[in-house]
Amino acid sequence: MSHKGWHSRNYLPHFDSQDVVQFVTFRLADSLPVEALQRLENADRPETLRHELLDRGWGACWLRSEPIARLVENAFFAFDGQRYRLHAWTIMPNHVHVLFSVLPDASLGDTVGSWKRYTARHANQHLGRTGAFLAN
């Protein structure tokens, strides 16, 4: 697997390499209201502000539910040691932080994407809902 090095999806730079420990945050789709997203567009330090805003606990906060939080953990545990090495994580009411290292035959994008797809699909099933569960 070739790693991309520095790249961006138009909003956050990423460094895809097996040689670095990755810190990734992903959030529920409703975790930031429109006004907060507008503030982020103009912020000097958007990542600092993003974390401050997420910690306000906006949205449905489905991750506060133990069964939903366990889905996130199950996603993390699924390929630990095969595609990545999981170092640490914390599950907040409306977002997740995870610290991990990507292994040679996996990529950052595929790894995070698989966690998000698994979590969204199973959480929506558990909650009896459809639609966006996690933000892009």
Per-segment meaning from a language model:
Residues M1-N136:
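Short catalytic/metal-binding and nucleic-acid-binding patches
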